[in-house]
């Protein structure tokens, strides 16, 4: 009799999916907000899945976490106070705390169970959550941002896809609240999905942010386990332009993806992406 194999498939569009071989189901739970699973995969190591969608894996998490963290943190000349909306796995906090000038990094996560599961089963990613410079606040990110004004140098929106609890993180009213939550020279970045499959979302978010922030930039990165592998990030800034960064500052931190040469290259957009945000 042939040995039975277990495969996981994420349906990324109605007509396309991402499939990988599973060697073990490590943990599953139905939280107050979503279905949570941690799977052991043959190709990518341990994988965090929320509501059937891959959030991160041990093998490729550095791509996403470095891109969403270091671009804004090197764009701001002195980011002392940083907030992460979402990102319960802790990967963004880990990258933020590589910057010595950061005095406090706040993780604003609605689902406590994501944090607890990540700390237990994904220690390589969540390792900085107990750092003395990190503070975890369990609350709704939209509520938190709307209740705090002129507070942060950088805000990073590390949200899940725009369904379920994350829907409000892609709306104009949220970006206005982010603007007010930032200090007078603050900036923010949000993950904004795939240019292949989410063109309307990227266009709408880019123009919403552009109507609020003096400087708005879109940049791209490669994340193998995300839909299409090509991923977009939208940055809104009150004062500092990521295209004017002194890239010599970038060499002083330890990274696997992000580097000085890559920083400005991230903002060189393919023609079809330029067309999306026209």
Curated annotation (Swiss-Prot):
Q: Which Gene3D superfamilies does this UniProt record tie to the protein?
A: Spermidine synthase, tetramerisation domain (2.30.140.10), Vaccinia Virus protein VP39 (3.40.50.150)
Q: Which residues bind spermidine?
A: 65, 89, 158-161
- Subcellular location, principal: cytoplasm
What InterPro entries does its record include? PABS, PABS_CS, SAM-dependent_MTases_sf, Spermi_synthase, Spermidine_synt_N, Spermidine_synt_N_sf
Q: What is its EC number?
A: 2.5.1.16
Q: Which GO terms describe its molecular function?
A: spermidine synthase activity
Active-site residue list = 158
Listed GO biological process terms: spermidine biosynthetic process
- What catalytic activity does the UniProt entry give for this protein? S-adenosyl 3-(methylsulfanyl)propylamine + putrescine = S-methyl-5'-thioadenosine + spermidine + H(+)
The places in or outside the cell where this protein is found are:
Cytoplasm
| Ligand binding (S-methyl-5'-thioadenosine) | 34, 109, 140-141, 165
Keyword ATP-binding in the entry? The reply is no
Top EC class, one word = transferase
One Pfam family, short name please? Spermine_synth
Give a yes or no for keyword ATP-binding in this entry: no
Which pathway, per its entry?
A: Amine and polyamine biosynthesis; spermidine biosynthesis; spermidine from putrescine: step 1/1
| Keywords for the protein's UniProt record, in alphabetical order | Cytoplasm, Polyamine biosynthesis, Spermidine biosynthesis, Transferase
Q: Oligomeric state and partners?
A: Homodimer or homotetramer.
The record's listing under NCBIfam families reads:
PRK00811.1 (NF002010), speE (TIGR00417)
- PANTHER family tied to this protein: SPERMIDINE SYNTHASE, SPERMIDINE/SPERMINE SYNTHASE
Write out the function statement from the record: Catalyzes the irreversible transfer of a propylamine group from the amino donor S-adenosylmethioninamine (decarboxy-AdoMet) to putrescine (1,4-diaminobutane) to yield spermidine.
What HAMAP family does this protein map onto?
Spermidine_synth
Its name, as the record gives it, is Polyamine aminopropyltransferase
What's the encoding gene here? speE
